């Protein structure tokens, strides 16, 4: 049985005066799914989020929430009727209302006096870990506490979709990690779908069900974090998703490419040209044989060693090209040592 998407965006285009900021955006989001819109500042990800919320009006395209059209030709459902939650960078709580009444505002009246509303508010405060803060006002809260209250307010009316615009960017690194984990856990437990805007690659790799890579108003690729990291469709996506080694290469056959390092097995299919570039991740290289059949074997020479405590970074030169390898277990090695270097996993060839 095929489940209908919770959200469907079709061929969305948006202009600010003569500048096009969204180019033919199309994607869908399943119920309970968490999607991260990942890209550099100014790439269009916040504009896309605001268009879904109803704060920005696209020039063309359609937005569907389940089987209900919320934006289309000559039709734009007002934001307050879309039944979506929205959380921005700094929470934006009402300073004259305490935590309880800020959350109650999410239910529509800001009072939360009847028994059903009280029960719902208490459930949400428990879920987001702010039950003990009910009587405090925003100025009495830390940045992380304010973000939890903002999420609680967005979850209060039980929306099926929550939109979050870089909700952790204003927090310091230690607090950001803690609040991020707590808020993601609360979202998972609530059963709501969510779309996050972020420029933090590591954050999206760690927490997303799917990631949409956005560049200059276009979605380059949307897929699971693992697929985007290890099997991206485009070289630019591959480089954006993590540290990479990119070398000119020639295709020897459909399974092998030749580059400065040597002959590299590749896993791409349907390659149209013989000349291109090969991409490898540094973590594919190891000084240890971690499997019976490594993908490839090279001879290398140690050029630099950097001890970092639990790991040691080692610069190895292979056929005149230097790469850095991080080893969790630090062997007794010296600069100038010659040793075998193992490659694990196949490379990616881009014509």
Curated annotation (Swiss-Prot):
PROSITE patterns: ABC_TRANSPORTER_1, ABC_TRANSPORTER_2, FBPC. Residues 7-241 form the ABC transporter domain. The keyword Plastid does not apply. It is an enzyme of class 7 (translocase). Pfam families: ABC_tran (PF00005). GO terms for molecular function: ABC-type ferric iron transporter activity; ATP binding; ATP hydrolysis activity. Keywords: ATP-binding, Cell inner membrane, Cell membrane, Ion transport, Iron, Iron transport, Membrane, Nucleotide-binding, Translocase, Transport. It is found in: Cell inner membrane. The keyword Protease does not apply. It comes from the Bacteria. Its EC number is 7.2.2.7. One of its GO terms (cellular component) is plasma membrane. ATP binds at residues 39-46. It catalyses: Fe(3+)(out) + ATP + H2O = Fe(3+)(in) + ADP + phosphate + H(+). Part of the ABC transporter complex FbpABC involved in Fe(3+) ions import. Responsible for energy coupling to the transport system. Belongs to the ABC transporter superfamily. Fe(3+) ion importer (TC 3.A.1.10) family. The complex is composed of two ATP-binding proteins (FbpC), two transmembrane proteins (FbpB) and a solute-binding protein (FbpA). This is Fe(3+) ions import ATP-binding protein FbpC. It comes from Haemophilus influenzae (strain 86-028NP).
């Amino acid at each position: 049985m095929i489940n209908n998407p919770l959200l469907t965006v079709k061929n969305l285009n948006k202009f600010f005066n003569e500048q096009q900021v969204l180019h033919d955006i199309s994607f869908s989001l399943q119920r309970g799914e968490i999607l991260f819109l990942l890209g550099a500042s100014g790439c269009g990800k916040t504009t896309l989020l605001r268009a879904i919320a109803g704060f920005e009006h696209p020039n063309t395209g359609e937005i569907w929430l389940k089987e209900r059209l919320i934006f289309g030709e000559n039709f734009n459902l007002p934001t307050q009727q879309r039944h979506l939650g929205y959380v921005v960078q700094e929470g934006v709580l009402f300073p004259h209302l305490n935590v309880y009444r800020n959350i109650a505002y999410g239910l529509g009246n800001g009072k939360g006096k009847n028994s059903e509303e009280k029960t719902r508010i208490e459930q949400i405060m428990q879920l987001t870990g702010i039950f003990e803060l009910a009587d405090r006002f925003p100025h009495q809260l830390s940045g992380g506490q304010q973000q939890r209250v903002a999420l609680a307010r967005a979850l209060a009316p039980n929306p099926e979709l929550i939109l979050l615009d870089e909700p952790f960017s204003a927090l310091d690194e230690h607090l950001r990690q803690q609040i991020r984990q707590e808020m993601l856990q609360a979202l998972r437990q609530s059963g709501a779908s969510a779309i996050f805007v972020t420029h933090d690659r590591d954050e999206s790799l760690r927490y997303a069900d799917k990631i949409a890579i956005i560049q200059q108003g276009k979605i380059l690729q949307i897929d699971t974090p693992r697929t985007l990291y290890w099997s991206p469709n485009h070289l630019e996506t591959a480089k954006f998703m993590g540290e990479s080694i990119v070398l000119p290469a020639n295709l020897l056959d459909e399974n092998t490419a030749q580059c400065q390092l040597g002959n590299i097995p590749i896993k791409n299919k349907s390659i149209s040209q013989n000349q291109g570039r090969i991409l490898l991740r540094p973590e594919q290289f190891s000084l240890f044989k971690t499997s019976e059949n490594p993908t490839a074997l090279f001879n290398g020479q140690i050029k630099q060693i950097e001890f970092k405590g639990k790991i040691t970074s080692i610069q190895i030169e292979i056929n005149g090209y230097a790469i850095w390898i991080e080893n969790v277990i630090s062997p007794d090695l010296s600069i100038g040592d010659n040793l075998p270097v193992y490659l694990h996993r196949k490379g990616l060839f881009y014509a």
